[in-house]
Amino acid sequence: MSYFKILGLEKEPFSTSPDPAFFYLSKEHKAILYKLKIAIRLKRGLSTVVGNVGTGKTTLARRLFQILRKENEETVLFHMILNPVYRFEREFLLYLTQLFQIEIDSKWPSAIECMKKIEDYLFRNGVEKNKTIVLLIDEAQKLSVPCLETLRMLLNYETNEYKLLQLILIGQMELLPRLRKPENLWDRISLKYSINPLGRDETEEMINFRLKQASRNGSSPILFEDGAIDEIYNYTQGYPRKITMLCHDALEALVMESREFVDRPLVCNLISKATKLVETEAA
């Protein structure tokens, strides 16, 4: 039997999979989503969200997709790229035509042909059908220079009032200096936002939220003592991925040791083991 079933939970509360249902929305996350929705609604073009590893960027992207699909299913065409490992312009453009479900007559279309097809797609849907076309790229720091140049060119397509492509780039901190390389791309960013780690109180709220989401009746079982949460925050520094992994280990230890609550000594023991393992691997 799974450990969470033993604790009376319906689902795994601390899975590292980017499930939007388990995404705790901090005040900052809510602010980012609100500003992105406004930027999309106003069709301002390019928006960027950056953050260190483990700050919840991918889950935020999935949450935005979920919100847009629910609120604007008939008016928004939402496309997402999760791992943009395309080295060449033609390769990237060909993938975009597939993503946008654009039919191409030629068996081996050139980059120019692909770009023309995408241009037609943007004007047909963005102007004639009055749709909002959104392209969200996660792990955007992986974009090659030719891909960034392609995106810069796609942002050129506009009416007198708005951009035809709403581009959201989400990535690690090194994304920002890379956006300065293609000419005029940096100046086109309408929204720049950096995700920070959670505070101590938000760490506690995140833990309780995920337990509530995993419970059978929607209540939040109290399994973590305050001292344990203090240690979790001090060790993870508020990074959601680290919080999730440590809480997962803590609940497994809770069941294996037949304890009632996760307390400070239990968490400290887990942290000590993790630290020794890292030191051993580094040696």
Residue ranges and their predicted role:
Residues L9-F14, R87-S106:
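Conserved NTP-binding/hydrolysis module of P-loop NTPases
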Residues M1-K43, E279-A283:
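A short, basic N-terminal segment
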Residues S2, P177, N184, K212-A283:
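C-terminal alpha-helical "lid" subdomain
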Residues L42-Q66:
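Walker A/P-loop nucleotide-binding motif
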Residues L82-V85, R178-L179, S190-E204:
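Conserved AAA+ ATPase "SRH/arginine-finger" region at the nucleotide-binding site
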Residues R69-Q98:
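AAA+/P-loop NTPase substrate/partner-engagement loops
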Residues Q98-F100, M173, L198-G218:
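Conserved AAA+ ATPase "sensor/coupling" helix adjacent to the nucleotide-binding pocket
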Residues F65-L68, L175-S190:
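Short regulatory helix/loop adjacent to the ATP-binding pocket of P-loop NTPases
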